[in-house]
C-alpha cells in the first residue's frame, strides 16, 4: 500500500510529459508554419524586384540544401514521412534515434525554410510529420515510456493535424499512411496527442480553414460525372508522379555515384536551375508551396492554364533533387488548379 503514492506519482509524471510533448508538437508546428510563410514571402519579395535572381539563388540554394542533407544531416532529405514510417518499423536503437533526433528536427525545419527562401517547390506539412514524431520519441526516451512506436505514430498524426489545423486529418493520416493496422492500445495515445496538438494550433493561429471556403455544390449527373473525372485524373497524375519520382531517383543515384564529390553538388544545382527556368517562364507561379494559388482556385479564381503543368514539373524536379521539403502542398495545388480548368471547360460546353 505504501508504494501506491509512488506509483501514482510516476504515472502522473509520465502523463504530464506526454501531454507536454503533444503541446510542444503543436507549438513547433505553428512556429514552423510561420517561418515557412515568412521565407516564401521573402523570396517573392526579391523575385518581384529582380526577376532573374532565381537563376542564381535557386541553383545555389538547392546545392547547399542537398549537400547539407547528405553530408551534415543524413536522413533529412525529402518529405520526412518515409523517415517517420521507417523509424516506426525498425527496432529500437541508434538508427531510430538518428532519424528522429533533436538535431534532425532543427535540420528539417531549417533546411526546408532555406529551400522556400530559394523558391523551391516544397511544402512544410511532410517535414512536420518527421518533426512531430521526433518530439514524441524524445519524450519517450526522457521519461522512460515504453511504447515508442505508438508515440512516433501519435507525433506524426499530431504534426499533420497542427499543420492543416484539422484534427480529423491527423487521425486519418495515422491510419492510412503510418499504420495499416491501428493497434487498440495506440488509439488513446494518438487521439489525445492529435487533440492537444490541434488545440494548440487553434489557440495560436485561430479557427481558420487551410484552403479557405467555397459555396460550390454538386448538381445533377453532370456534377457527379465531374467528380469521377477529377478523381480519376488526380489518381493518374499521382501515380505518374510517383512512378517518375522513383525512376528518376534511381537514375540520379547511379549517376551521382560515378563522381560523388562533383556530381553530388552539380545534380541538385541543375535541378534548381530547371526549377528557376520553370518559375520564370510561368511568371513565378511554380515557385513556393502553391498554397495561395490553390486557395484562390478553391474560392473560384481560375489561375493561368500553365500553372498546373509547371507546378507538377517543378515539384517532381524538387522531389528528386535530394533537398528536404514536402510535396503535400504543391501536390494539392496541382489538383485544385487542374480541377478549376476542368470546371471552366464544363461551363464552356454548357
In which residue ranges do the predicted regions lie?
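Alpha-helical transmembrane segments and immediately membrane-proximal extracytoplasmic
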Residues: 1-343, 349
Amino acid at each position: 500500500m505504501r508504494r501506491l503514492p509512488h506509483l501514482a506519482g510516476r504515472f502522473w509524471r509520465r502523463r504530464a510529459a506526454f501531454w507536454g510533448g503533444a503541446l510542444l508538437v503543436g507549438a513547433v508546428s505553428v512556429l514552423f508554419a510561420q517561418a515557412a510563410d515568412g521565407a516564401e514571402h521573402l523570396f517573392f519579395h526579391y523575385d518581384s524586384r529582380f526577376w532573374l535572381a532565381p537563376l542564381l539563388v535557386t541553383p545555389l540554394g538547392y546545392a547547399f540544401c542537398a549537400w547539407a542533407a547528405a553530408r551534415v544531416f543524413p536522413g533529412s532529405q525529402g518529405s520526412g514521412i518515409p523517415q517517420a514510417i521507417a523509424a516506426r518499423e525498425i527496432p529500437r536503437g541508434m538508427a531510430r534515434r538518428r532519424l528522429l533526433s533533436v538535431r534532425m528536427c532543427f535540420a528539417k525545419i531549417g533546411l526546408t525554410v532555406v529551400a522556400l527562401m530559394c523558391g523551391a517547390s516544397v511544402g512544410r506539412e511532410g517535414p512536420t510529420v518527421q518533426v512531430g514524431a521526433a518530439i514524441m520519441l524524445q519524450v519517450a526516451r526522457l521519461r522512460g515510456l515504453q511504447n515508442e512506436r505508438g508515440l512516433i505514430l501519435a507525433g506524426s498524426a499530431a504534426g499533420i493535424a497542427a499543420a492543416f489545423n484539422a484534427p480529423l486529418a491527423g487521425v486519418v493520416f495515422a491510419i492510412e499512411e503510418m499504420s495499416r493496422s491501428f493497434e487498440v492500445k495506440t488509439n488513446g495515445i494518438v487521439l489525445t496527442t492529435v487533440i492537444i496538438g490541434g488545440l494548440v494550433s487553434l489557440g495560436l493561429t485561430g479557427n481558420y480553414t487551410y484552403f479557405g471556403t467555397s459555396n460550390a455544390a454538386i448538381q445533377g449527373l453532370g456534377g457527379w460525372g465531374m467528380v469521377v473525372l477529377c478523381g480519376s485524373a488526380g489518381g493518374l497524375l499521382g501515380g505518374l508522379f510517383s512512378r517518375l519520382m522513383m525512376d528518376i531517383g534511381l537514375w540520379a543515384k547511379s549517376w551521382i555515384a560515378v563522381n560523388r564529390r562533383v556530381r553530388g553538388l552539380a545534380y541538385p544545382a541543375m535541378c534548381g536551375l530547371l526549377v528557376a527556368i520553370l518559375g520564370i517562364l510561368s511568371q513565378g507561379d511554380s515557385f513556393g508551396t502553391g498554397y495561395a494559388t490553390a486557395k484562390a482556385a478553391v474560392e473560384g479564381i481560375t489561375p493561368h492554364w500553365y500553372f498546373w503543368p509547371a507546378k507538377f514539373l517543378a515539384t517532381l524536379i524538387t522531389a528528386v533533387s535530394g533537398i528536404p521539403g514536402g510535396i503535400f502542398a504543391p501536390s494539392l495545388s496541382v489538383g485544385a488548379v487542374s480541377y478549376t480548368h476542368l470546371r471552366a471547360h464544363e461551363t464552356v460546353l454548357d
